[in-house]
Design a protein with these regions (language model features):
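Flexible loop/turn segments at secondary-structure boundaries
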Residues: 143-146, 163-166, 195-199, 223
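Conserved beta-strand signature within the Rossmann-like core of class I S-adenosyl-L-methionine
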Residues: 155-157, 183-195
Length: 235
């Protein structure tokens, strides 16, 4: 996905907007001014055409995302949905402060950096013995969780991983999440193009925090997700 994003910034966007226009867009300090700039100077027919091509189902499936992420997605107008989500995001998040949008439009980060790349946080990570607390596994989540003892994890950050699962596979993963979670563990995840929630038969073990999720989604720098979810595991 990162390579695809750099390709978009390097080869597609310059066909639409000059570097001067891009830098202006990324320097605006006011939401209302940003909305006006997007409406009057950014949202051209050429922008819609090339954004539509670059974020079409065919292109994303071939170059940007794993093919399996589209197995259960039946939406054909993916590009239109993503453009509308971008516009929704620009109504509440300044592009200037959005490192993801900087990367998407420039092909690199500007002054705004993800936390782990900021000097203070980088030095904090550098001081830690990451080898003793971090492990990398290249197996699917269901298999990994089945290999772990019960009551192991306090946090789950699962991105939009449920997107690629069938309803039955989704249920199995949630059963394993509950089994391996400590009481009070927090599970966060996103829905993108496929709606996947925890199975209703497990609702006795799961508490929703929809209000907090809605507040945080308003601040989300990544525009293309549909919804953000926060669940607490109750045992």
């Amino acid at each position: 996905f990162e390579r695809f994003t750099v390709w978009f910034a390097k080869y597609v966007l310059p066909i639409v907007h000059s570097k001067k226009t891009i830098l202006k867009f990324l320097s605006i300090n006011d939401i209302d001014e940003q909305k006006k700039f997007y409406r009057d100077q950014w949202d051209s027919r050429r922008w819609r055409l090339l954004f539509g091509l670059a974020s079409s189902r065919l292109v994303l499936k071939r170059f940007a995302r794993q093919y399996s992420m589209f197995t259960y997605n039946k939406i054909k107008t993916v590009a239109v949905i993503y453009r509308k989500r971008l516009e929704r995001n620009l109504n509440s998040v300044l592009a200037k402060n959005n490192f993801f949008l900087h990367y998407s439009l420039m092909g690199r980060y500007g002054e705004e950096l993800p936390l782990y790349l900021q000097e203070k946080e980088y030095l904090h990570l550098k001081e830690k013995d990451l080898g003793s607390i971090l492990s990398i596994n290249t197996i699917d989540l269901s298999t990994y969780l089945k290999s772990q003892p019960a009551n192991t994890f306090s946090k789950f950050n699962l991105s939009d991983i449920f997107e690629a699962l069938s309803p039955s596979e989704n249920d199995v993963v949630w059963e394993e999440i509950i089994r391996t979670a400590k009481n009070g563990a927090v599970v966060v995840y996103w829905n993108n193009l496929v709606k996947r929630l925890y199975p209703i038969q497990l609702s006795a073990y799961i508490k929703n925090n929809e209000e907090k999720a809605a507040v945080l989604q308003e601040k989300d720098r990544v525009f293309f997700y549909d919804s953000f979810h926060i669940n607490t595991i109750i045992k």
